[in-house]
């Protein structure tokens, strides 16, 4: 397991990353990761309820799907949070079938509560959360013929969620782009800058091999402030 403790946006954050340990099933691997995460967070006076974002990695589609089901169980109720998931065999250093990245936040105000916004109707991913003035959106995707088509669909939806949360692209502090390996980062950047003029302080890029369903070419995660 990797653990990083840092301050950002006037809050305390804990980033945890781990691959599954040998288990009877992928679901059991994922369950074990969340148990380990919860123990780490408890040692810092936090719990899974402080989760604001999780990113799930599967070795293949079946692993992603089973891991996603287990994550929905582990991060339910007060632990519900922004999420994304990917298929990416080269992400793994072990023989694990599933890996997880989790970001937990210690709010500056002890009485701060998460505001959870669902899609209508609700689906597996949360639309976004607001926690002590921090806005965290789940990864946003689309199934359309080309990357250009998908970006033209995704970016206005992100803008709508930011506006609904009391934020905007101008208040975005981080954007993560998880691009299908068949696509070029240069093309992605051109498409993004064509539609979004705001200067985002942190922008990170990954190549992945698959998503929650076939036909997706990009998933974008955004964090902002209100």
Positions of PLM-derived features:
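N-terminal presequence-like segments and the immediate start of the first folded domain
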Residues: 1-173, 179-226
């Amino acid at each position: 397991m990797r653990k990083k403790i840092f301050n950002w946006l006037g809050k305390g954050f804990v980033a945890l990353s781990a691959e599954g340990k040998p288990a009877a099933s992928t679901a059991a691997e994922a369950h074990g990761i969340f148990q380990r995460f919860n123990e780490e967070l408890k040692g810092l006076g936090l719990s899974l309820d402080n989760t604001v974002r999780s990113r799930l990695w599967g070795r293949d589609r079946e692993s992603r799907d089973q891991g996603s089901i287990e994550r929905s169980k582990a991060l339910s109720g007060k632990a519900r949070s922004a999420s994304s998931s990917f298929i990416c065999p080269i992400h793994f250093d072990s023989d694990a079938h599933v890996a997880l990245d989790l970001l937990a936040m210690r709010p500056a105000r002890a009485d701060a509560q998460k505001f959870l916004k669902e899609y209508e109707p609700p689906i597996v991913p949360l639309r976004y959360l607001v926690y002590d003035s921090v806005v965290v959106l789940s990864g946003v995707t689309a199934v359309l013929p080309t990357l250009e088509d998908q970006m033209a669909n995704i970016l206005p939806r992100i803008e709508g969620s930011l506006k609904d949360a009391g934020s905007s692209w101008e208040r975005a502090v981080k954007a993560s782009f998880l691009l299908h390996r068949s696509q070029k980062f240069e093309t992605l950047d051109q498409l993004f800058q064509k539609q979004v003029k705001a200067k985002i302080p942190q922008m990170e890029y990954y190549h992945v091999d698959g998503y929650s369903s076939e036909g997706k070419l990009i998933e974008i995660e955004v964090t902002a402030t209100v």
